[in-house]
């Protein structure tokens, strides 16, 4: 099976490339086709917006998408950067076309070749074989049903973890453990009602996974919360010895955080450093940065509806921060509505990702919080004014569906990949596509 993958820009934020592309095969030559016609054969090519091609000292003006094929089946785009890879290598055929004064790149390759790149980027090859197999099924299924449709982009998926799943190209060689995971699950996908499921995954759920509808908007309508998906329900990652608080409460999060020393006796993902995090932020630093974060969210068309200012204030002054309060939590304890009390009224922020972004703070080294499964300790001075904030949290990522480090913990405890997937996607089953 062949699929098309959209290659995003260096920031992984969009499909449009505004600079000059340098494309070269890893060995042999590169052939450029427009339709069925061969334009040229060369050692390398530079492509500028407007589909201006320069190769072997000659200039070509293309009027339609150009497809590049290399003799060896591999090529580099030396102007692209991916995390940890200066010049990613790709297998397959590359299609380049114009799009509003920029270029768009899409890669045609086999589904298995795509999965090799995804698994290498998403999960360490050193993980247990059964955890790797579980990730392989998630990657294969997600390629068939991404959360956000890319039909208008003429691709099946994109390569960005900000939108789909991370595909950073291909290394010089494929780790045999990744190859074994792909081959050991050949043709297998996860289905519900005989259709591929939305196989979401994240790094670490912090002791309990979360319901889909508490973390994501509807991909078509944008509505939040969206209709629930029966196989994306939050599940516990342990037996929680000695727990007295209700699961999902703030006290539950504090219990997990304070008992992290119990290791896997507590839960399957507790072995990882990503299980919990802690930040201290001074009041001065909060005042300096938080209102700017709110402004950025309100300036963004997609996030603006989920930032609610005090009644009657419109987009007026933010005010001085008095306290933070989580108004609504999901089944795992994830914050899905946050109140920020100021002297000018109460601001509310909805959705876990936006709540994480609100706390971006260069002074504290925070780009965004690792997760929104958070609780606070707020400190006040003698005048009763906020002096500082401590944010404690659990997990890394949205925590919906398959969680990689929990899967590793379950595999080490003796579960096979089918049992692991049944745990994370209740009601789904494995089928041949």
PLM regions and their residue ranges:
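Conserved, single-site charged/polar hotspot
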Residues: 1-433
């Amino acid at each position: 099976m062949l699929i098309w993958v959209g290659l995003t820009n260096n920031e992984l934020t969009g499909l449009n490339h505004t600079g000059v592309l340098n494309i070269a095969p890893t060995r042999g030559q590169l052939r450029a086709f427009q339709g069925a016609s061969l334009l040229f054969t060369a050692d390398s090519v530079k492509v500028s917006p407007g589909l201006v091609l320069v190769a072997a000292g000659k200039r070509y003006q293309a009027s339609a998408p150009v497809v590049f094929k290399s003799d060896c089946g591999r090529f580099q785009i030396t102007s692209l950067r991916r995390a940890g890879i200066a010049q990613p290598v790709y297998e397959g055929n590359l299609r380049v076309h114009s799009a509003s004064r920029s270029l768009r790149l899409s890669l045609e390759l086999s589904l298995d070749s795509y999965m090799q790149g995804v698994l290498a980027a998403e999960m360490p090859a050193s993980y247990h074989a059964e955890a790797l197999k579980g990730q392989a099924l998630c990657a294969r299924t997600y390629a068939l049903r991404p959360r956000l449709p890319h039909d208008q982009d003429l691709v099946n998926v994109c390569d960005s973890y900000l939108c789909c799943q991370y595909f950073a190209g291909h290394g010089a060689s494929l780790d045999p453990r990744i190859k074994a995971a792909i081959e050991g699950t050949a043709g297998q996908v996860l289905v519900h009602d005989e259709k591929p499921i939305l196989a979401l995954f994240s790094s670490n759920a912090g002791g309990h996974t979360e319901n889909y509808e508490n973390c994501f908007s509807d991909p078509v309508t944008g509505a939040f919360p969206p209709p629930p998906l029966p196989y994306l329900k939050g599940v516990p990652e342990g037996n929680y010895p000695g727990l007295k608080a209700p699961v999902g409460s703030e006290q539950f999060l504090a219990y997990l955080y304070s008992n992290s020393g119990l290791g896997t006796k507590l839960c399957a993902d507790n072995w990882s450093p990503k299980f919990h995090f802690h930040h201290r932020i001074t009041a001065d630093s909060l005042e300096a940065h938080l209102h700017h974060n709110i402004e950025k969210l309100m300036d963004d068309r997609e996030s603006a509806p989920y930032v609610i200012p005090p009644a009657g204030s419109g987009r007026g002054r933010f005010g001085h921060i008095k306290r933070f309060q989580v108004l609504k939590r999901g089944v795992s304890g994830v914050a899905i509505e946050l109140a920020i009390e100021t002297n000018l009224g109460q601001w509310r922020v909805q959705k876990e990702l936006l709540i994480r972004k609100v706390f971006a703070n260069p002074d504290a080294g925070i780009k965004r919080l690792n997760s929104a499964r958070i609780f606070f300790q707020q400190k006040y001075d003698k005048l009763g004014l906020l002096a500082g904030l401590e944010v404690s949290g659990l997990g890394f990522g949205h925590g919906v569906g398959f969680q990689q480090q929990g899967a590793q913990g379950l595999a080490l405890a003796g579960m096979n990949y089918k049992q692991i997937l049944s745990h994370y996607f209740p009601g789904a089953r494995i089928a041949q596509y």
